[in-house]
Structure formats: C-alpha cells, structure tokens
Amino acid sequence: MKRLVVAALLTLLGAAASAQPGSVMGVWLTANGKAQVRLAPCDSPASGPVCGTIVGLINPTGPNGQASAPDQAVDHNNPDPNLRGRKIIGMPLIWGFQRTSDPNAFDGGHIYNGENGKVYTANISLQSDGTLRLRGYVGSPMFGETQIWTRIQ
C-alpha cells in the first residue's frame, strides 16, 4: 500500500512538473478549441528548441465533413497525397523556431494548418496572463493572424 501511495505521488509530481507554468512547454488548447497541442523540446536539435505535437482532438471531422473518432482522424487536407492518411493525433504541428532574448518567446518557426494543408511562418510567446500568443504569417508578421491558446497542463 505504501508503494502505491508513493507511486501515485510521483506520478502527480511528474504531471505538475511537465506543465511548467512559467514556460511555453506544456499542453495547450488551440484558439478554435478543436485541438490539444503538446509543446516540448524537439527530438532533434535541427528542429529547434521547441516543437508541438497534436495530442488530442475535439469533435474532428473527415473529408466529407462527417464526424470522425479522434483516434481515426487523418490529415486529409495535406497537399502531399502520401501524407493524407497519417493520423492527426501524434502529428507534428509546430517546429523550427529560434530562441529570442526572452526565454519564453520564439521566432521564425513553422506551423502546419491542417484545415487547409498549408505551412506558415510563426512566432510564439508566453503572455503575462499565462496564455500562449501564436502569430502565423506569410512573408511578414504584419500580414498574418494571431491566436491565443489556453494552457491545459
């Protein structure tokens, strides 16, 4: 019984540590409320200091607009026919950022928009209220869209 309590405490401490409230690292709900994205250090240094992977979907739809089970949803809008069958959960969404002088702001990265199959240049930064500001754009940040993501973990 004592081991079970210790194991439960270690699990809770690990979950709390992974959220890192003073960091962009953690799990975020996208602005449209359709996806949960885990921001974490990239597996490869060539991919930058922070990468994002889709870890959850809320009410996904298939290519015909009909409801799809989250674990069955695929990247049907991808311009590469070879990637249209890949599962959305587990799919890389954000990569290629460079650090800025602010430890919680990253510039010059990329974000994949699964709704239209396009990749945009992006900047991300942790805001003072704990939300994540993401700006996706083509060419110049002046010509883009800003989204505010909410931390889940």
Explain the meaning of each model-derived region.
Residues 25, 31, 36-121:
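Central antiparallel beta-sheet cores of small beta-barrel/beta-sandwich binding domains
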Residues 43, 126, 138:
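A short beta-strand motif that forms part of the nucleic acid-binding face
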